Amino acid sequence: MKSRGAGCSARLLLTVGWLLLAGLQSTCGINVTAIQDPSLAREGEGEPEGDEEPENDSETEKEPQAEAEDDSEGIGIREVILTSGCPGGESKCIVRVEECRGPVDCGWGRPISESLEHVRLACVHTSPENRFKYIWRLLRPDQQAIILANDSAILEVHRDTHPKAFECETLDNNEIVASIRFTIYTTTELQMKRASRPDTDAVLVFVLTIGVIICIFVIFVLIFIIINWTAVKDFWAKASTTEIQSELSSMRYKDSTSLDQSPTDIPGHEDDALSEWNE
């Protein structure tokens, strides 16, 4: 009985451990995606290429994610990965790294670094950085944009009393291959956003900690019940027997009380009947 209980508890521990590991991996995946370098471009979904490999070899493309809303925009670098036929028995291996392109409009991006005084912005580009030409513009509502003198991929902007919008175009051989825009908030707006933003990391850590504690407690309770199943069963049997006996005792008490009260009630009814007869 003990060996069977130990086997069940081991399987239960293994299952809960896998569930906790999956939850932590998903959380880490979200955090990694959020801090990727915005200088990487948005890239389109690549098609598998198998011209250089046998027909039974399948290739998939792994593309870096950029800071724009859609990861199929702009210009970037992708890795062509072979999923079968790799040397040394490896499940995956990189065949080559190549450049890929998607739609020119990359939407609104995020700064690569920012503080209360200044912000650093980055155009969409790939290595080497100097192979492209960059045009920065200051966007103005209902007015023509102002072309800035900066021609590098990085632009450092100081915060002003009013929010500003910037746009960067990446050109390759005088052809626009990517365009991305940024919004620079004022210091007051940034402080308000930071104050109103919930501390998701602290909440996530708290929830995970409570969940782990509850899971460990439940696991120990189940292990205790499985190992001491006979004692638990006897305890439940005694508890149910005691409850049944108490219910029977209460029923007997009620029956005895009703029997004691019934003889005193009968003479009263007889006297009432005789008085009515005499009248």
From Swiss-Prot:
Modified residues (Phosphotyrosine): 253
Domain of life the protein comes from: Eukaryota
Localization in the cell: Cytoplasmic vesicle, Secretory vesicle, Acrosome inner membrane
Protein's membrane topology: Single-pass type I membrane protein
Signal peptide region: 1-29
Principal cellular location given in the protein's record: membrane
Keywords for this protein: Cytoplasmic vesicle, Glycoprotein, Membrane, Phosphoprotein, Signal, Transmembrane, Transmembrane helix
UniProt-listed GO biological process terms: acrosome assembly
Comp. bias intervals (Acidic residues): 46-58
Residues that bear Phosphoserine: 262, 275
Region Disordered: start-end pairs: 39-74, 253-279
Transmembrane segments: 222-242
Keyword check for Lipid biosynthesis: no
Residue spans, topological domain Extracellular: 30-221
Positions on the Cytoplasmic side per record topology: 243-279
Sites carrying sugar chains: 31
Entry keyword annotation includes Nucleotidyltransferase: no
Any one GO cellular component localisation term in the record: acrosomal membrane
Subunit structure: Interacts with CYLC1; the interaction may be relevant for proper acrosome attachment to the nuclear envelope.
Function (record text): Plays a role in acrosome expansion and establishment of normal sperm morphology during spermatogenesis. Important for male fertility.
PANTHER family (alphabetical): SPERM ACROSOME MEMBRANE-ASSOCIATED PROTEIN 1
Name under which the protein is recorded: Sperm acrosome membrane-associated protein 1
